[in-house]
Amino acid sequence: QFFEVEEQINSHLSKSSASVSGKIRIVADSAIHIIQILKSFRKIYPDVMVDLTIGNSREVTNAIRNYDAEIGVIGSPVEGPDLQTVTLGTSKIKAIASKKFFSPIPNSLSFQDLRKLPLIFRENGSHTRETLVSEALEKKIELSPVIEVTGREALHELVANGLGVGFVSYAEIGQDPRLVNLDIDTGNAEMTETLMYLTARKEVPVIRAFLKAAEKP
């Protein structure tokens, strides 16, 4: 358990005040999914510094398993005896486009429609991409991007400027007035937002503290 030496530096449990201090490293596929938990955590544990990094699902899982972060949040269920998980919620995958892209704007898009459109995908390792492509293949439809981009913010900008149609979970759409979101009417693809941490580190004070904050309504 030599990896836990880092916790003597990054966090500790003050027996005198029963408060947690130090730093917690969080890697998430989107900050949106943990905003409310972070608010609760900061209110309960104001002395803990939060280091938040954004990455795709593969990067998040690797960071947890490599001891590069205490908490991970991704848009898919995770399995493995080395991991403990908490389901935060589910959200359907939606197509997004510039309001000027379609004329008129359709109510929804089918996989057949998508195959004819310029698609913008996130990089390999994005669970949104993997889920969408997998479901389309089940219906014998192959979806291919004209642009592949790293990061959700870059995807939003390309889509908002009319370069193609992108995909995000409903929770990640945000408030960009340039965008319209559309149902994928032949699809049931959804994201299951999952909080994870290593089983071997379940007694680390900042991890226990974050889980406590996640339980708050």
Label the model's feature ranges:
Residues 22-80, 149:
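Central regulatory/effector-binding core of bacterial HTH transcription factors
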Residues 181-217:
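A late-sequence structural motif
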Residues 103-104, 109, 118-139, 203-207, ...:
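Secondary-structure junction motif
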Residues 37-46, 112, 129-142:
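Ligand-binding cleft/hinge of the Venus flytrap
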Residues 59-60, 65, 75, 127-182:
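Hydrophobic hinge/microswitch elements
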Residues 18, 83-119:
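Flexible hinge/capping segments at coil-to-helix
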Residues 84-94, 170, 177-192:
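Short beta-strand->loop
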